[in-house]
Amino acid sequence: MIKKIGVLTSGGDAPGMNAAIRGVVRTALGAGLEVFGIYDGYQGLYEDRIKQLDRSSVSDVINRGGTFLGSARFPQFREVEVREKAIENLKKHGIEALVVIGGDGSYMGAKKLTEMGFPCIGLPGTIDNDIAGTDYTIGYLTALNTVIEAIDRLRDTSSSHQRISIVEIMGRHCGDLTLTSAIAGGCEYIITPETGLNMEQLISNIKDGIAKGKKHAIIALTELMMDANKLAKEIESATGRETRATVLGHIQRGGKPTAFDRVLASRMGNYAVHLLMEGHGGRCVGIQKEQLVHHDIIDAIENMKRPVRTDLYKVAEELF
């Protein structure tokens, strides 16, 4: 059985990452394993920023946002020589397996290490909720609450000024965060990678709302789809109603994780250690229908696709 494991966080931070690290560390120590923290993601792995952790290392972190191990984007990890150096550093410390917490880019790094014979377990840590093989990612529901709070505030001022507001929400190529934020925040319109934008229909809907006496409208837009400020100008020109864009940006990644994310992250961290002790490597952890599951990490990246939430889009359409 393995005796030493490492844990790192990579890519964009997400609330609950610290809880996941804590879950890994406390479970491993309780099972008699040694645990090493790799600081600043794959870059720290390459540069040998590796330190042994104990119980006190993860005291009072469960309620903190971000990741105390730090994170960094490190595109050089695509290079074989860089990964070979990383594995050399792991072996120098006697580390036999690695838990990687992050998004799809982090999973790709874990996949590459797995293909080179070093066992890794991936935990889905991203607010985008865009990882295949899991219903929820660590940090997604905390970010949802953050976005809803912002939408509530925008609604107050938009109503006061009879204004149309566009709120740009993170998610990259996945509209889950935008979709659920729009439903929970009572937005009038939604634009995601899954729905696209029918400008003619959008303008028609806004004009219909104005004719019915609506004082404001909130439009939820997934980032990277289009320039939010340009869209605001086009809507204002077409409707005659003042329109402003608000880009929430990185505020969505911060803040204390919700109870759900703390429990989810703790469960996933615990589960990852048990998988490694049972001899499983090259896996990624998810939660599906409230049950923890694990999938082949290569298959998850190359073949598995996240299902489009057609049920929620139907709800959104009927409510808007």
Swiss-Prot record:
Residues the record lists as binding Mg(2+): 104
PROSITE patterns for this protein: PHOSPHOFRUCTOKINASE
Enzymatic reactions: beta-D-fructose 6-phosphate + ATP = beta-D-fructose 1,6-bisphosphate + ADP + H(+)
UniProt binding sites for substrate: 126-128, 163, 170-172, 223, 244, 250-253
Top-level taxon: Bacteria
Keyword Transmembrane: no
Compartment list: Cytoplasm
Residues annotated as binding ADP: 22-26, 155, 186-188, 212, 214-216
Its job: Catalyzes the phosphorylation of D-fructose 6-phosphate to fructose 1,6-bisphosphate by ATP, the first committing step of glycolysis.
Listed name of the protein: ATP-dependent 6-phosphofructokinase
The species this protein was found in: Vibrio cholerae serotype O1 (strain ATCC 39315 / El Tor Inaba N16961)
Lineage: Bacteria, Pseudomonadati, Pseudomonadota, Gammaproteobacteria, Vibrionales
